[in-house]
Structures are given as C-alpha cells and as structure tokens.
Amino acid sequence: QLLARFPDSAYAPDARQRMVHMRNMLARNEIHVANYYFRRGAYMAALNRGKYVVEHMQQTPSVADGLAIMGQAYLLLGLDDLAEDSIAVLCENYPDHPNLTSGCEFDSVYTMDGLQRSWINQATLGLFDPPKPPQFNYRPKT
C-alpha cells in the first residue's frame, strides 16, 4: 500500500527492494518445499511447487530450479514428453544449471525407486554412505 498511495515517498525505494527480496524468499521457500516433497516421494506435489514458481514468480532467481524440479518430477511420473520440454527450456535459458551436463543432458538423481544408492550403501543395508537427497536450490543465500 505504501507504494500505491505514496509512490514519491522517501521510503518508496526501500519498500520496493524489500518487496523484491520477499518475493525471492517466497520463491526460494517453494523450492525448499518441493525438495521436501521429493524426499517424501510426493512427485506430483513437487511438480506443482516447481510449476507455481515458473508460472507466478518469473522474475525471481528460483525459476531455473523450478524448471529443474518440473523436469525431474515429469521424469519420475513417466511423462517423458513434458520432461523433455521442461529440460529444453532449462537448457535454453539456464545452460549453466548444476543439473545439466555439458551436452544439456539432465542429470537425474532420483529414480523410480527413490534415491540412487551406492553399492556400499546397498551392501550395508543403508548403514554406511547414506544417499544425499539432491537439492534443486543451488543459488547462494543472500
């Protein structure tokens, strides 16, 4: 309301910066929740969180992570055409994203059985070398 009612106020620039920061934090929180849903195996819920970031928070740094979440979730749900579309958009707009290899191939960490586990973890029934769930939030915290 401050910006709408008093656009020429001395506090307006600070209010704009705070609103941008809050929008970035909300988008980052959506990515964090999507990571939680991946760990729980709720791939459709993670997909919806990623899609929300891409559709409604387009000017935030978390859009790349939202696209990666969409690609991963579509792969896990067996929707390969939609996964390819999401990964193509990610590759076109964010070629340096950590989940993309040098040839713009998507580095999928999750499988249909859950996390990819090392042979040590499998041999020790999960006692040693536990899998680290991937985090699609690669942006540094500000």
Label every PLM stretch briefly.
Residues 24, 28, 44-47, 65:
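Amphipathic alpha-helical repeat elements characteristic of tetratricopeptide repeat
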Residues 29, 33-42, 84-142:
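Terminal, low-structured helical/coil segments at or just beyond the last alpha-helical repeat
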Residues 4, 8, 38-50:
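Helix-turn-helix repeat elements of alpha-solenoid scaffolds
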Residues 2-17, 21-25, 55-63, 77-80, ...:
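Short solvent-exposed coil/turn linkers within tandem alpha-helical repeat scaffolds
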